[in-house]
Design a protein with these regions (language model features):
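Active-site recognition of the HExxH zinc-binding catalytic motif
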Residues: 187-203, 335
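Acidic, low-complexity proline/glycine-rich segments
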Residues: 8-27, 151-169, 244-247
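Auxiliary, metal-adjacent structural segments of Zn-dependent hydrolase domains
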Residues: 53-171
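N-terminal low-structure segments adjacent to metalloprotease catalytic domains
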Residues: 1-103, 341-383
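Post-HExxH zinc-binding segment in Zn-dependent metallohydrolases
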Residues: 133-154, 201-254, 259, 263-291
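Pan-zinc metallopeptidase signature
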Residues: 255-383
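Short pre-active-site segment immediately N-terminal to the catalytic Zn-binding motif
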Residues: 172-193
Length: 383
């Protein structure tokens, strides 16, 4: 494209920026492909080992939890590029609700208020689809970054919307084992246990709907700061700058910045942390007899959650959504204390109703949670 004249570049960009929906998923796919990299072949023997470990995991998990057991989906041991392609829209709940806000900010009336954008020729006709294009860039960048970080669906911190297929991203699990000096076979079993556990949690009938409700409530409070974006648009001196802005490079990661309501953010943080913390506890119990190195694996994984990474930093900057996944450790301690005080059945009550999930404050106050959930329910039963 760089060899074309200005009008040729604009024509190509115009085609890429076209979208019939709130998000330009064609542009998202291009950005994701660029970031995820080329496909890698997965050793068939390793893939088969993962599938066998998933069957072992199903049996072990059934022995330690009453979580619903959906029809087991075949575990997909895959590479980064394939995972990214098959999950391109799995996290659309984090992007699509923002389209209405952007529509108001990028309509023709708003853009006419920017003197520097006047008289820019072909660029003016490209600004109409700016909102869907911006969201496409953000969606593609988010999934592209995730593909290099996530160990499986369980390690995204976010329920997938499009499908129920369990995945492990083999190169990332291999890197995790190497980075922490842990036996590959133990990491593979641990990864399979986590993915199967997450798959079961996602089978709770209200889980995905509740997450959507929390995200939509949170996004009602999000306000975008468009100054950086408009500054880039007004400062453009050539068409290649426009091309770079919608490419998979550092220019794309800071197009939008958002502020949001901290209390509604805490609701999402509690939701995702509890799912991860509960899963940690299940995996720890299910793998105790099979994984002599489970303490090292869990320590490394918890430490990893506290480390900054591009996917989560991008999500925080783009939408103001900071998951604070390190809270999973607090949630796991909450689970342990509830079971110690009131038994496994008390903890299992969480899955009966979305309002029974603990808040961030209740992670350190299980007695308060008990008073809100268990005692209130007991009182209702005696009426």
């Amino acid at each position: 494209m760089y060899g074309m004249d200005d009008e040729g570049i604009f024509e190509q960009l115009f085609k890429l920026l076209q979208s019939s929906g709130p998000v330009n998923w064609n542009l998202a796919r291009e950005v994701t492909k660029s970031l995820a990299g080329p496909q890698q072949l997965i050793d068939p023997e390793v893939a088969e080992e993962y599938r066998e470990l998933a069957h072992v995991s199903e049996v072990r998990i059934s022995s330690v939890t009453d979580l619903p057991s959906p029809a087991p989906g075949e575990l997909n041991p895959t590479d980064r590029a394939t995972w990214a392609a098959e999950n391109q829209q799995s996290f659309r709940v984090l992007v699509e609700p923002l389209s209405e806000k952007l529509t108001g900010l990028t309509d023709s009336d708003s853009l006419r208020d920017i003197p520097e954008l006047g008289g820019m020729g072909a660029m003016g006709s490209m600004l109409a689809p700016l909102g869907p294009a911006l969201l496409g860039v953000q969606a593609g960048t988010m999934v592209g970054f995730m593909s290099h970080r996530a160990l499986g669906q369980f390690d995204t911190g976010i329920p997938a919307m499009d499908h129920d297929r369990p995945y492990v991203i083999v190169p990332n699990l291999d890197d995790f084992a190497i980075d922490h000096g842990i036996d590959h076979r133990q990491v593979r079993l641990w990864g399979a246990l986590h993915e199967v556990t997450f798959h079961r949690i996602m089978a709770v009938e209200w889980i995905r709907g509740r997450f959507v409700e929390l995200v939509e409530a949170f996004y009602e409070t999000v306000e975008f700061d468009m100054s950086d974006l408009m500054g880039k648009l007004s400062a453009m001196q050539d068409p290649e700058a426009m091309q770079r802005m919608f490419g998979a490079d550092e220019d794309a990661t800071g197009l939008l910045k958002a502020t949001s309501d901290s209390s509604r953010l805490a609701d999402i943080q509690a939701f995702t942390a509890f799912i991860e913390g509960y899963a940690d506890r299940v995996v720890s119990m299910a793998g105790a007899e099979l994984l002599p190195g489970i303490d090292r694996i869990e320590e490394a994984f918890n430490r990893r959650r506290t480390e900054p990474n591009k996917a989560e930093q991008f999500l925080q900057e783009f939408a103001g959504l900071e998951l604070e996944r390190w809270r999973a450790k607090d949630a796991a301690r909450f689970c342990d204390e509830v079971v110690e005080r009131w038994g496994e059945d008390a903890l299992a009550k969480v899955w009966d109703d979305p309002t029974y999930m603990p808040t961030v404050a209740e992670f350190s106050d299980p007695i308060g949670w008990n008073a809100r959930v268990l005692l209130d329910e007991s009182a209702l039963g005696n009426d």
